[in-house]
A protein has these predicted regions:
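Conserved phosphate-binding catalytic cores of ATP/NTP-utilizing and phosphoryl-transfer enzymes
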Residues: 4-7, 115-138, 314
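Glycine-rich phosphate-binding/hydrolytic loop that grips phosphoryl groups
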Residues: 123-124, 299-340
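N-terminal beta-alpha supersecondary unit
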Residues: 6-89, 118, 122
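Short beta-strand scaffold segments in enzyme catalytic cores
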Residues: 19-25, 139-141, 147-151
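A contiguous, well-structured pocket-lining segment that forms one wall/lid of small-molecule binding clefts
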Residues: 76, 192-271, 280-289, 294, ...
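Glycine-rich phosphate-binding loop plus the immediately following alpha-helix
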Residues: 131, 154-196, 222-223, 227-232
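Conserved phosphate-binding/catalytic loops in two-lobed NTP-binding clefts
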Residues: 115-116, 271, 288-311
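Glycine-rich beta-strand-to-loop/alpha-helix junction loops that act as flexible
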Residues: 85-88, 105, 143, 272-280
């Protein structure tokens, strides 16, 4: 962990379709200012994120959000002592916008900057909560692009215990939402609709839960929803709600079984959960009930989706002894296990 004192870290998140900016005070251990802008409405008509649109919107919003974040913290930009930015994984264009902006600010202020692994930031933000987990712990990262089970042994030392072999959890939610004609983004829409449905109405598979490994597969579950949908002659809101609820229950059951098995295998009793899908209240409750007796840590709902706070906080660990470097070293594809190699 960083030994830097009196450090205020500016965090910049632009890996996909959220522009997030925050300032973390390492002395008070507080996020003292934070702004988040979502582009979801701009991508809704396309049914998913359009990289070019995302890049242009980040370019338009990032600098004003940085100014607002600094102002609301009661600071001057010169008071910032380090800059952290998402360097991967993510969309190349959006990553470049964030990285180049961070590097420009760092150079103008003669301050250090550091690139942060997006998924590690999702993992670490839980350490800011009270109570907080202690290394080592098991981590479940569930988002639009990832589904990972990780043995977090120490800072920067992560063993992949299980991962998706096809669709990520959030991706499956988006695709099922498209089948049900709910629109984008699918996660919140399915969760809302499922509240009115019967989770036992459709007998959907719990993929790979009979396998001895801890990997995931959600493509077949998505296909099962598609075939159930096609078999119905007259689709109405009740049937859609039942399908949404049944799908959501299948996902939650699958996650619970895989996590439970992984905790038994690793001997870890603390579970950290992060990523956008971790904001799903049904999944949260299912895991809490199913893992009774274990210690489970969730970030606040607003910190589950991509945000600048997690980047600023992660940056506080890595800014020690960082030298000025203007290289735009982004990594659109960046396995979390690569951090183990330094």
């Amino acid at each position: 962990m960083s030994n830097l004192k009196l450090m205020k870290v500016l965090g910049i998140e632009t890996s996909c379709d959220e522009t997030g900016v925050a300032i973390y005070d390492a002395v008070t251990r507080d996020i003292i200012s934070e702004q988040l802008y979502s582009q979801a409405s701009k991508h809704a008509e396309y049914g998913g994120v359009v990289p070019e649109i995302a890049s242009r919107d980040h370019l338009k919003k990032l600098i004003p959000l940085i100014r607002l974040t600094v102002k609301e913290a009661g600071l001057n930009l010169r008071d910032i002592e380090g800059i952290a930015y998402t360097s991967g994984p993510g969309l190349r264009g959006p990553l470049l916008i964030g990285a180049s902006t961070a590097k420009a600010i760092a150079m103008s202020l003669n301050k250090p900057s550091v690139g942060i692994h997006h998924m590690e930031a999702h993992l670490l933000i839980n350490l800011l909560e009270d109570p907080a987990p202690s290394f080592p712990f098991l981590t479940l990262l569930i988002s639009g692009g990832h589904c990972l089970l990780i043995n977090a042994k120490s800072l920067g030392n992560y063993e992949i215990v299980g991962q998706t072999l096809d669709d990520a959890v959030g991706e499956a939610f988006d695709k099922v939402a498209k089948i049900l004609d709910l629109g984008y983004p699918g996660g919140p829409k399915i969760e809302a609709l499922a509240k009115n449905g019967d989770p036992n109405a459709f007998n959907l598979p719990r993929p790979m839960t009979t396998k001895k490994n801890h990997d995931f597969s959600f493509s077949g579950l998505k296909t099962a929803v598609f075939y159930e949908f096609k078999k119905i002659n007259k689709i109405n809101d009740v049937i859609k709600a039942d399908l949404a609820a049944s799908f959501q229950a299948a996902v939650a059951d699958t996650l619970l079984m895989k996590v439970s098995s992984a905790m038994e295998k690793t001997g870890l009793n603390e579970l950290v959960i992060g990523g956008g899908v971790a904001s799903n209240k049904y999944i949260r409750e299912k895991l809490v009930i199913g893992l009774e007796g274990r210690s489970i840590f969730f970030p606040p709902i607003h910190r589950c989706t991509d945000n600048g706070a997690m980047i600023a906080y992660a940056g506080s660990f890595y800014l020690k002894d960082v030298k000025q470097d203007m290289t735009l070293n982004i990594k659109p594809r960046w396995p979390l296990s690569d951090l183990n190699d330094g």
